[in-house]
Every structure is written in C-alpha cells, then in structure tokens.
C-alpha cells in the first residue's frame, strides 16, 4: 500500500500538485486512516517522495581516491537526476519554505518540519580524500563551499535565473567545484 500511495503522490507532484495526506488518500481511493498510517504528515509524504526521487543519488559511491574526481562524479551523477525529478524537488522546496515562513510567523501547525539534508553526507563522502590533508576545520569549510554548488537550489537558480540547460548547468557546477577544491589544496 505504501508503494501505491507513493506512486500516486509522485504522479500528483509531477502534474504540479503538492497533495496533503488527505488529498492523496482521496486520489488513491483509500481511506484517510490508511494514508495517514504510512504518511502521518505532509512533511513525511514529501520526504518520502524526495527520497524516492533521489534514490540513486543517495546510494552514490565512488572508487576513486581523488577528491576532485569524486566530486565531479557526484555532480555528473546527481544533476541529471535532479532534472528528471525537478517538479517533485520544487514541491519539496515549496513545502520547506512554507513551513519556515509559518514557523517564523509563530503559526507553525505542529507538523514536523520537512528536513532535507543528504547534501552534507554526500559531499563529505565525495571530498573525503581531503579530510586528513586539510584537517577538520578546513575540511568543513570546503564542504560548506561545495554545498553552494550542489543541490536542488543551485539547479533551480541556474535553470530559472540563468536559463541554462543541463549541460551548461553541469559545466558551471563542475568548474566551480574544481575551483573550490583547487583553492582548498593550496590555501594556507
């Protein structure tokens, strides 16, 4: 049943809807109780859709011992997947932004916030050959810098504001990541 609900949610999001759990139940023709059993909140639903959309990215591994190659592999692997599931990822950002605005306005509905964040672990894995060379403080700075060139937000800025296609997006993020890593290796 979870798979059926998740598939329906992905279909709804692909058509531009960000369903509540109740709306998903209605569209999937199951009881609300059933839908809420699998997805107690909209955040849980959206998080499941994001995990499903990004699945192969989250399982990414590299055999290379070189940080520049590893980061490059991650970018080449991840950004086409982001393009493929762009609508679902936009929905996740929308929910996250709405929850943040409501919380800041003191109107949080008590729903657990949508927590996005596989970025740190993926970038940490990709850049891991630098950890011992740089030391923990500099390594963390490199991860923070790389987080500015990796992720859905970066994809959307380059697509929506700069009107780049996927090849141009990849050229831009790869060039920037290489510059960050080059600088990190020479920064004293």
Q: What do the PLM-derived regions correspond to, one by one?
A:
Residues 1-23, 27:
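Short, amphipathic alpha-helix enriched in basic
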Residues 3, 7, 76, 80, ...:
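Generic detection of well-ordered alpha-helical segments
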Residues 10-18, 47-77:
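Amphipathic alpha-helical linker/stalk segments
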Residues 29-39:
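Short hydrophobic/aromatic patch on the recognition helix
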Residues 41-46:
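Short amphipathic alpha-helical segment with a characteristic S/N-K-E followed by hydrophobic residues
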Residues 71-104, 110-114:
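Helical hydrophobic small-molecule/effector-binding pocket
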Residues 84, 100-144, 171-179:
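Amphipathic alpha-helical packing segments from all-alpha helical-bundle domains
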Residues 129-176, 184-188:
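Hydrophobic/aromatic-rich alpha-helical bundle segments in the mid-to-C-terminal region
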């Amino acid at each position: 049943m979870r798979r059926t609900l998740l598939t329906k949610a992905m279909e709804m999001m692909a058509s531009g809807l960000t369903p509540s759990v109740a709306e998903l139940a209605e569209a999937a023709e199951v009881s609300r109780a059933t839908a809420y059993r699998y997805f107690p909140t909209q955040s849980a639903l959206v998080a499941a859709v994001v995990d499903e959309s990004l699945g192969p990215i989250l399982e990414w591994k590299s055999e290379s011992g070189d940080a520049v190659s590893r980061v490059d592999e991650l970018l080449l692997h991840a950004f086409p997947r982001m393009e493929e599931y762009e609508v679902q990822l936009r929905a996740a950002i929308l929910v996250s932004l709405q929850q943040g605005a409501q919380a800041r306005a003191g109107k949080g509905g008590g729903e657990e916030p949508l927590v996005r964040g596989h970025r740190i672990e993926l970038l940490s894995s990709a850049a891991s050959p630098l950890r011992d060379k740089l030391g923990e403080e500099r390594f963390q700075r490199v991860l923070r810098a790389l987080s500015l060139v990796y992720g859905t937000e970066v994809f959307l800025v380059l697509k929506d504001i700069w009107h780049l296609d996927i090849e141009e997006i990849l050229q831009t993020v790869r060039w920037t990541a290489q510059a960050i890593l080059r600088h990190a290796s020479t920064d004293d």
